[in-house]
Amino acid sequence: MTSDTNKTTYSGKTPWSIWGTVGWGLVVGIVFIVLQGAVLAGFVAREVAKNPDTDIYMAAKELGKNGFLMALATLVTTPLCIGLVVLLVRLRKGPTIARYLGLKTIALRTMLFWLGIITLFALLAELLAHLAGWPFMPDFMVAAYATVYFPPLFWIALIVAAPLFEEVFFRGFLFEGFQHSRVGPGGAVFLTSLAWTILHVQYGGYELGTIFALGVIFGIARWKTQSIFPPLAMHSLFNLLAMAQLVFYLGRA
């Protein structure tokens, strides 16, 4: 499957400690929330300007499900937050950005193996949802797609931008710090999966369980290959399949 299943070794300064990783991770998380909130605030201000009697709380609640806003917020936060992650790696003054974030090329057959794994997982997850009678498509995504206005922007945000930031942050920065701490690679897989699941609290219980399981698969791929590219490709493929499923569902609804 891969010729490198051990964590990266460093001859000089190692990644941030576990507490440094957690602390700086929280900083990135806060910046992410602030940037997303700033985009939302701009949309709310626009609504209030058009109608001064607008209930700000209700406007924010409704706009939080707006697909166009989601896409725009994602496209704004992705480059800025990735830039912050890169800055934090440089502040460590030792590990290279490529090594720290797992920017390591891998064999094509290894990539195809992991893409096959995620495709199989997507099929099994959908079969389980069907057998259990769970909703075919989350209401949150249906509502979001109804307000995308420009679908290509939404697709780019979910298939390219969101996976790029999330993998650089979770399976890149956080994973590398955790796997070189006392929790080791196994702890890194668990902790990054948990943190990534918390990021998606807008979904229901089944979806959150699926997201955690996905995080575990992504984390194992990162661990076994010591590369961010397999989880990044799997993440994009899974989102692509989910978007195709959403369009199919709306076409039948």
Question: What are the roles of these predicted feature ranges?
Answer:
Residues M1-Y100, L240-A253:
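N-terminal, membrane-interfacial amphipathic/helix-forming hydrophobic leader that caps
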Residues T77-C81, F154-A157, T210-F218:
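Hydrophobic core segments of transmembrane alpha-helices in multi-pass, intramembrane catalytic enzymes
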Residues R171-R182, A244-Y249:
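Membrane-interfacial alpha-helical segments at the cytosolic side of multi-pass membrane proteins
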Residues F43-L72, R92-A162, H180, L250-A253:
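Juxtamembrane helix-loop-helix connectors linking adjacent transmembrane helices
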Residues G94, R182-V183, K224-T225:
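Helix-loop interface residues and adjacent transmembrane-helix termini in multi-pass membrane transporters
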